[in-house]
Amino acid sequence: MSKTRVALYREEDGSCPFIEWFDKLPAKVQDKCYLRLERLREMGHELRRPEADFLRDGIYELRVSLGGVHHRILYFFHGAVAAVVSHGLAKERVVPSKEIDRAVERKKRFEANPAKHTYEEA
């Protein structure tokens, strides 16, 4: 199985919502998030619970829990070999609809212009 390319979503202003969220996390949570992203690279569409789950409208979540806090990384697939990370959040019970809606909007913008909305580190 070939690896899935994982890209990060970039806003119009050049900012990356995932990086902004990730940089504020404790080191242990960052490590677990990184491991989930690696599993996404390895497994792609085949990644399932408890590591990932489908939410709705083409949006999936990577699931990370540590110390009773449930962190989620929302992502979507673009083509057969790319997963695009929209953003991350901490949640209590279910992922709020507004967060899924935000990911859906980012998915639409990305699909309209992938090059413009792919984050590249400087």
What are these regions (language model features)?
Residues 1-70, 79-83, 89-122:
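Basic, Lys/Arg-enriched alpha-helical interface segments
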